[in-house]
């Protein structure tokens, strides 16, 4: 029997974990190991994926993946043991007893040396909140070279010569996701002086798996038990002193959200870093456990590779456990010769035979066995938390079989209505009024001062009009990210991925891709930016490439302009057809991408569903500031340059004389070269190609350009047939997004991908418009 067949509410014991490569390792790292008890919680509304409970936390996985996990001993779910309310157990302050700070007088690092810290932890454990408490307003966003995963660096408040780096949230140090590789590479290559490992105290078993792997890196380390206030409120506690003794590192109970225990955490972190007090325990395997097979294996590998590990500057215990798992990256770095590789495989095979488990499962089982012992000795189980009970009630509606999709549609409709119809639009209109007023004031001042006409035109027609039109979108983007951050931080976005995964998987994507593409209907720029949250590089790239096919709000003026001029009786029908046309083209391209550029092993949909929580006001505010600053820094500079270029081309002729008629400008000449390309589509007039070129700057400018060049709607209708108008609408729907969106794509994927988007979408738009014309001619339109 497999996990796929387990009825809802039933519990079973895992016997075999199937699969291979990244999929199987991901299962094991998430706690799906032989001899673990697993309970089926529910199915997604579409029947796939499923939610299961294992090691006291909830995970989601697809039915196809669940079918590779064999189970037996099916039984009714045991009722959780309830803890009794206890008082908080006191924790010794810095240096009390001297147990973990015995080097207080032994060779500290010089006061002038920079103390660097890596802040590491699982997703949804409060890491960002802790980082903000530690650094205040001193953080800034940077990038790892070659990897589009954000990190944050900041100085610990009140502590000079310190720098803490907030690493991506991960569940293990296995080299299968970009986040895991980034975190591991940072610690191994950048050599931080200390690690601050933040652990969700409400879910200790899940979090300690990463803790053990971090300890194996043999870097001075302190463990921050976050959300201890929630544990106490729900009747639980943690015997901190006993946990310190079991782990061999300082353990500090904190509440990052309430700023409790932060000063003590900082004191411990600085102390272990300054005196280089490394974890006292690196060995988690007992010689008496399961016949000592894993113990002998790991220690045998350590003796075998010790000199290679020292030469490669990799902690020997970490290298040994990774080799035992079958980590190819570590094997390559160590540079073992053939005899040593054969000896390594012999040691591992002997362990597998004695243990009765394969190498990866045996190592994962060893870790979870140790975690179980530590938790049994140190963790007093709380009552079922208020947050979990509340989440269960909310999930009955938000992930219910018949209510999930209507709720999702309603929530997203509300977000878009508030963003593009009420709050965002209102703020955008206010900013636009301010920009218009400022433009008029500057225009009058420059006229009064008799400023040179060329400079006057550059400032007013170029910079103010061009940059100002794009700057007015900032409130919409900030408002949209405000609502998205509320949904993300509350835990709802994880449910959206759970609900929509089956539908999106049919076109080669995962459920996580739904949000960026939905955002793309409002604006491509935040849609592309939102794709950063996707864990799979393949899915992230596909989502970014597909998002521009979702018709953004800036194209609405184009649709409204042409439908009013050519199809006034069928305006709504034409608009709906255009939106669905973009969706259909996106689906078609997803299928093509999945068969061509983005072949490969699908990333497993193994995801933890966090409890619903109210987002912190401070965190949301800081996120909005970061997004606003990010948009201005990335898009504003590109738009500024592009505005000046387009102004120059519109203002001068080939002899650099100021033109009085736009058809004599350099832009018109260039557009004249492009115009024949659109001849087969029915709109070969240079004025249309000019409008399309200016549309690259901002889609709204297509309408304003046509209005200026034609003078009236009647003149436009005389030149363009209804069929050609449909072809032009099709082209506008699908051709390259605006320069701000391309700048975002360049930021996320690089210049080659951005150029590919521009060229590829123009080609796709031309082909689609040509097919529309052929069909129109055939049906006599």
What spans do the regions from the language model cover?
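Hydrophobic core segments of alpha-helical transmembrane domains in multi-pass membrane transport
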Residues: 407-418, 480-485, 563-565, 578-592, ...
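Juxtamembrane inter-helical linkers in multi-pass membrane proteins
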Residues: 433, 437-441, 494-524, 599-623, ...
């Amino acid at each position: 029997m497999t996990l796929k067949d387990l009825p809802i509410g039933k519990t079973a014991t895992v016997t075999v974990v199937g699969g291979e490569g990244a999929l199987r390792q991901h299962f094991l790292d998430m706690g799906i190991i032989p001899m673990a008890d697993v309970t089926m919680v529910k199915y997604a509304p579409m029947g796939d994926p499923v939610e299961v409970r294992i090691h006291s936390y909830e995970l989601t996985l697809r039915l196809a993946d669940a079918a590779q996990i064999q189970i037996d001993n099916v039984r009714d779910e045991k009722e959780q043991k309830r803890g009794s309310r206890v008082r908080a157990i006191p924790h010794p302050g810095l240096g009390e007893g001297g147990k973990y700070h015995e080097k207080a007088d032994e060779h500290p690092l010089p006061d002038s040396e920079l103390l660097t810290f890596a802040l590491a932890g699982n997703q949804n454990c409060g890491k960002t909140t802790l980082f903000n408490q530690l650094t205040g307003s001193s953080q800034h966003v940077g990038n790892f070279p070659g990897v589009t995963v954000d990190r944050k660096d900041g100085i610990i408040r009140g502590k000079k010569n310190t720098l803490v780096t907030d690493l991506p949230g991960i569940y293990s140090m296995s080299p299968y996701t970009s986040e895991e590789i980034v975190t591991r590479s940072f610690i191994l290559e950048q050599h931080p002086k200390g690690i601050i490992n933040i652990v969700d105290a409400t879910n200790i078993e899940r979090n300690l798996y990463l803790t053990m792997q971090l300890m194996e890196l043999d870097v001075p380390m302190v463990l921050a038990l976050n959300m201890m206030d929630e544990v106490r409120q729900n009747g639980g506690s943690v015997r901190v002193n006993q946990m310190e003794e079991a782990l061999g590192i300082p353990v500090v109970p904190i509440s990052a959200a309430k700023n409790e225990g932060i000063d003590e955490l900082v004191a411990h972190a600085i102390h272990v870093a300054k005196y280089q007090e490394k974890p006292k325990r690196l060995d988690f395997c007992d010689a008496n456990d399961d016949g000592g097979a894993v113990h002998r294996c790991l220690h045998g590998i350590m003796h075998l590779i010790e000199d290679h590990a020292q030469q490669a500057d990799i902690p020997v215990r970490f290298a040994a456990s990774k080799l035992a798992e079958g980590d190819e990256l570590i094997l390559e770095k160590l540079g073992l010769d053939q005899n040593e590789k054969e000896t390594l495989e012999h040691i591992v095979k002997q362990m597998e035979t004695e243990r009765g488990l394969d190498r990866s499962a045996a190592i994962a089982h060893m870790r979870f066995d140790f975690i179980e012992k530590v938790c049994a000795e140190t963790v007093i189980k709380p009552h079922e938390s208020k947050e979990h009970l509340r989440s269960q009630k909310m999930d009955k509606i938000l992930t219910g079989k018949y209510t999930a999709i209507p709720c999702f549609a309603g929530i997203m409709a509300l977000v878009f209505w508030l963003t593009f119809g009420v709050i965002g639009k209102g703020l955008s209109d206010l900013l636009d009024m301010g920009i218009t007023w400022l433009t008029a004031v500057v225009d009058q001042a420059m006229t009064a001062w008799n400023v040179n006409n060329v400079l006057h035109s550059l400032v007013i027609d170029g910079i103010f009009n061009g940059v100002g039109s794009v700057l007015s979108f900032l409130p919409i983007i900030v408002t949209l990210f405000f609502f998205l951050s509320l949904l993300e931080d509350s835990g709802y976005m994880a449910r959206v991925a759970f609900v929509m995964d089956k539908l999106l998987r049919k076109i080669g994507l995962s459920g996580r891709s739904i949000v960026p593409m939905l955002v793309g209907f409002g604006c491509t720029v935040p849609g592309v930016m939102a794709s950063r949250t996707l864990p799979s590089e393949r899915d992230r790239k596909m989502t970014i490439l597909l998002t521009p096919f979702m018709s953004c709000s800036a194209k609405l003026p184009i649709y409204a302009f042409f439908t009013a001029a050519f199809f006034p009786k069928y305006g709504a029908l034409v608009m709906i057809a255009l939106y669905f046309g973009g969706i259909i083209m996106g689906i078609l391209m997803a299928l093509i991408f999945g068969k061509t550029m983005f072949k490969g092993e699908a990333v497993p949909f193994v995801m933890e569903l966090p409890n619903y929580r109210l987002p912190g006001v401070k965190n949301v505010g800081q996120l909005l500031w970061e997004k606003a600053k990010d948009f201005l820094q990335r898009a504003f500079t590109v738009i500024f340059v592009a505005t000046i270029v387009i102004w120059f081309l519109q203002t001068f002729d080939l002899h650099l004389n100021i033109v009085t008629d736009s058809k004599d400008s350099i832009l018109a000449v260039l557009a004249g070269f492009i115009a024949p390309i659109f001849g087969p589509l029915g709109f070969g007039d240079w004025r249309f190609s000019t409008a399309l070129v200016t549309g690259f700057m901002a889609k709204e400018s297509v309408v304003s350009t046509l209005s200026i060049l034609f003078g009236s709607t009647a003149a436009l209708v005389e030149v363009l047939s209804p069929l050609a108008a449909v072809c032009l609408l099709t082209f506008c729907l699908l051709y390259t997004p605006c320069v701000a969106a391309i700048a975002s794509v360049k930021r996320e994927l690089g210049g080659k991908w951005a150029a590919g988007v521009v060229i590829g979408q123009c080609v796709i738009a031309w082909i689609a418009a040509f097919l529309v014309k052929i069909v129109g001619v055939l049906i006599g339109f």
